[in-house]
């Protein structure tokens, strides 16, 4: 009995580190680009990246923000989404 329990525990631990990635079949037309694939159909999506800007930056606690502009060294370090 103990051997059977030990064997079952080992099998469960071996299978526990697997992740299954699948797609839900639906009639959605939303397509997104993921890290590993392009044009993947999803059930719903929300655009989180701003595509427009008013041109003004707000100061926070009296400190002006740093404009990262085009992929400068500071942009890479601070995580400019355009880089």
UniProtKB/Swiss-Prot annotation:
**Cystine connections:** 71-83
Tell me which Pfam families the record gives.
Answer: Hemagglutinin
Q: Does Hydrolase count among this protein's keywords?
A: no
Keywords assigned by UniProt? Clathrin- and caveolin-independent endocytosis of virus by host, Clathrin-mediated endocytosis of virus by host, Disulfide bond, Fusion of virus membrane with host endosomal membrane, Fusion of virus membrane with host membrane, Glycoprotein, Hemagglutinin, Host cell membrane, Host membrane, Host-virus interaction, Lipoprotein, Membrane, Palmitate, Signal, Transmembrane, Viral attachment to host cell, Viral envelope protein, Viral penetration into host cytoplasm, Virion, Virus endocytosis by host, Virus entry into host cell
A GO BP term here is: fusion of virus membrane with host endosome membrane
Residues modified by glycosylation: 26-27, 39
Q: What else is known?
A: Major glycoprotein, comprises over 80% of the envelope proteins present in virus particle.
Give the record's subunit note: Homotrimer of disulfide-linked HA1-HA2.
What protein am I looking at? Answer: Hemagglutinin
Source organism (scientific name): Influenza A virus (strain A/Tern/Australia/G70C/1975 H11N9)
């Amino acid at each position: 009995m103990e051997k059977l329990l030990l064997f079952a525990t080992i099998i469960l631990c071996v299978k526990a580190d697997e992740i299954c990635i699948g797609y839900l079949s639906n009639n959605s037309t939303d397509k997104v680009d993921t890290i590993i694939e392009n044009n993947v159909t999803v059930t719903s999506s929300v655009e989180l990246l701003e595509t427009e800007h008013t041109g003004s930056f707000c100061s926070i606690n009296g400190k002006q923000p740093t404009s990262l502009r085009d992929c400068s060294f500071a942009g890479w370090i601070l995580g400019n989404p355009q880089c």
